[in-house]
Amino acid sequence: MTKKILLIEIGTEELPARLLSKISLYFYKNFIKELDFHNISYKNIKYFSTPRRLALKIKDIDITERFVEIKKRGPSIINSYDKDGFLTEAATRWLKHCGININQAIRLKNEKGEWLFYKTRKKQENIESLIPKITESALKNISIKKSMRWGQDNQKFSRPIRNIVILLDKKVIPGDVFNITSKNLLQNHLSLKDSQIKIKDAKDYPKILLEKNNIIADYFIRKEKIIEDIENIAKKIKGFIKKNNVLIEEVTALVESPKALLVNFQEKFLQIPKKILINTIEKKQKCFPIYNSEKKLLPYFIFISNIQTQESEKIIIGNQRVMHARLSDAEFFFKNDRKVKLESRLLSLKKVLFQNNLGSLYEKTLRIKLLIKWIAKYSSSDVEDSIRAALLSKCDLVTDVVCEFPELQGKIGMYYALEDKEKKDVATALEEQYLPRFSGDKLPCTLIGCGLSIADKMDTLSGMFYIGNIPSSDKDPFALRRLAIGIIRIILEKNIPLNLEDLIKKSLSLYNKKNEEDLILFDKMIKFFMIRLFHWYEETGYSAKIIKSVLSCKSIELIDIHKKIQAISFFKKLKDSQSIILSIKRISNILAKEKEKINGDINKKLMIEKEEIILFNNIEEFDNYTKNLFLEKKYNDILIKIKSFENPIYNFFKKVKIYHSDSKIRLNRLLLLSKLKKIFFKIADFSYLY
């Protein structure tokens, strides 16, 4: 077995920073799939990525000449020869298909009979000719939504590919990938893009890049170096860096030869609101702000350069100038905004379109005001404060700061509201209205914030359904699924007793749609929410069967649904709960056989067997015991009580003949079973649990 090191490096133009990790991981996984498909063994694979290269290093790849055994069974011997001993047409066709004569065929005999059989060994394609094909296939199968095309051949990838290296130990593997011939010249740093780095042996990768031009090809090593460097620099000025994994990942994907540099800015800029300052440094400039021990910003930031140079001072001065300009703009926008109060911007929203056919942001604000007023009755939040928050909710969208930094919407509204001496809960709600922003994000903390978030999201959902912008199976351009999950989470996790049906109807009514399409829209929205609810519970870890058993009962109160799902999950874990479920199944099967509806009241006088009387008494006792439990939605207690039916049901089926010769007695017993089924199905459709 011959084993060698295989190196593949794909030199590209600058890859998108936000996609670099995804692209490199897909390349790695796709390549492994290709190796497995071709039965090529190896010890391990390591992948590398920088903004201008994707690479794989495969250790101990087996390049031994390989053979595959081919077996082909032909027609049976009986069908292969005629009565005179000559080959039949079926046998002749099979021999021709195999490319052999009858002397090369053998006979395969077993207990079922005897057939013509052909067995041979075929040499597989040489691994050296396979690798370029495998590489191109692995790259082409990377799932990228947006790609670029280049060259006369109209090649397609995330960014144009400019260089290919395929090296097996010291040997260059000849072949083309994206019509680029492989060689042993690695793509150099962007500052030296006209020159290349010659690599003689695959084992030298990625060390040779570091030695020649300080390029760190390993994404994870590069990331750790950046973290270590910025922390050390911050310590030197008695500061620290707050963890920001998103920024770290982005910067790591932007550079391949990182060098951390300390840069200062004028202290006057510390008067700018902290969130504006941080946003400018982190989001706009991709730099790291530094904090003191009291978690206050220091007049410094750290910039990650993409080049190792002796002229660091020039880079520092350049970044100082750029940051000064950015912070000056932010300072100007902030001061300009504070010339007027936040509330005075309300009428300006009339000039801002919310969505085609849905009016302006001012009209949306008025709808939110009416909806939050209605929600406040259920959330126990202050009605006047809720209305105030609604009226201010979109005012920051026409401020200079938010126009320049859209990601600060809500945050700036809260800050300006506090400056205007608005109540703290009202101001906080302006930021909280956008929560949760993504899966697993935090929820609003204030009751007003919860109400405002629900009202805003529900108004958007209703509006989009109203104009037909409904998500399809693969497209959701307005992130309506996320909005629905946000509403669901707030109602459930904050225990707000909102009826989803009433909420949707109230929201739709604010669009003044009063015709036969009302019901169609409502049904579409309910279905949309129920699908989202199902998926959310499934992702949370609940059994799909349990979720379906509860949702199929058409309950629209989310808190009620939640309690039922929790209770059924609890019940399923109880000892012997399965026997009750099987009893319910038996009852359902008996009732399903009846062609006519089973209607009427149970007549105790028609009960002649002790076991049916005991079962009836148990039902009456259960109804009395659980009457208040149902009102209080104590489903755990109800299900525990349901377990008390286990023996009475068992004895009933054992001793009582349901299909009695007397039709009245038979009907009475079926009514008894029907009553039992209704008890169980008040909580969930147990047929999903069988």
From Swiss-Prot:
Its main location: cytoplasm. Signal peptide: none annotated. InterPro entries: DALR_anticod-bd, Gly-tRNA-synth_bsu, Gly-tRNA-synth_heterodimer. One of its GO terms (molecular function) is glycine-tRNA ligase activity. It comes from the Bacteria. The keyword DNA damage does not apply. The keyword DNA-binding does not apply. GO terms for cellular component: cytosol. Disulfide bonds: none annotated. It catalyses: tRNA(Gly) + glycine + ATP = glycyl-tRNA(Gly) + AMP + diphosphate. It is an enzyme of class 6 (ligase). Keywords: Aminoacyl-tRNA synthetase, ATP-binding, Cytoplasm, Ligase, Nucleotide-binding, Protein biosynthesis. It is found in: Cytoplasm. Its EC number is 6.1.1.14. GO terms for biological process: arginyl-tRNA aminoacylation; glycyl-tRNA aminoacylation. Belongs to the class-II aminoacyl-tRNA synthetase family. Tetramer of two alpha and two beta subunits. This is Glycine--tRNA ligase beta subunit. The gene is glyS.
